[in-house]
């Protein structure tokens, strides 16, 4: 039944969140709010890497569940979108005198939610704050900026591709003025890609000669 599928999904995702050190805040329908850094933290960078690693494992697990459900005749298996942001939030017991919940609040939570809704299906979308913390270990593709209520500037986003050291098809480097992101699995014409890189090199060389 639909209820059994959702329960199985939430159970599997919760187990993965706990494995990576995440704190499960709440379930909202078939969505899960997870945060890192409280009550224990490994530091901003490691917390961010753990969170993205958790998200990648969640999508892998969901894919295997989807295969199982299809074999059982489920026509429309579950899909997921994941949004991740790193920032300052308030964590504690909030609520009324009769009922308190240990939860996280703040603009960062709203931004993560906006990233989730802006993500493509079965993809992970990061804010630039998270990307800057994980870019040495996680390959990402630069995506469009999004406007978020309560934030006065467009938020640059990045889509997760995989671990840099485990995926030889991915390459991503950034220096001031130059951002290079390569995914060999998506290149259909190597000659066109080589020509593009050659044109960029010519422009760089010509600027040095001026």
Where does each model-flagged region fall?
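Alpha-helical scaffold within the catalytic cores of cyclic-nucleotide enzymes
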Residues: 7-22, 38-82, 86, 107-109, ...
């Amino acid at each position: 039944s639909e209820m059994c599928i959702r329960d199985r999904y939430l159970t599997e995702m919760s187990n993965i969140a706990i494995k990576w050190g995440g704190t499960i805040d709440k379930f909202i329908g078939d969505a899960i709010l997870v945060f890192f850094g409280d009550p224990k933290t490994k530091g901003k960078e490691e917390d961010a890497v753990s969170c993205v690693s958790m998200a990648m494992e969640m999508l892998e697990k969901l894919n295997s569940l989807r295969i199982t459900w299809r074999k059982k005749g489920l026509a429309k298996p579950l899909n997921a979108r994941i949004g991740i942001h790193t920032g300052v939030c308030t964590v504690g017991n909030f609520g009324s005198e009769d009922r308190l919940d240990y939860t996280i609040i703040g603009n960062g939570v709203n931004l993560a939610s906006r990233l989730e809704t802006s993500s493509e299906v079965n993809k992970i979308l990061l804010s630039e704050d998270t990307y800057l913390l994980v870019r040495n270990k996680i390959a990402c593709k630069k995506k469009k900026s999004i406007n978020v209520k309560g934030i006065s500037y467009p938020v640059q986003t990045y889509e997760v591709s995989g671990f840099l050291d485990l995926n030889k098809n991915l390459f991503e480097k950034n220096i001031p003025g130059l951002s290079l992101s390569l995914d060999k699995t998506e290149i259909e014409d190597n000659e066109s890609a080589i020509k593009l890189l050659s044109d960029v090199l010519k422009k760089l060389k010509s600027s040095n000669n001026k």
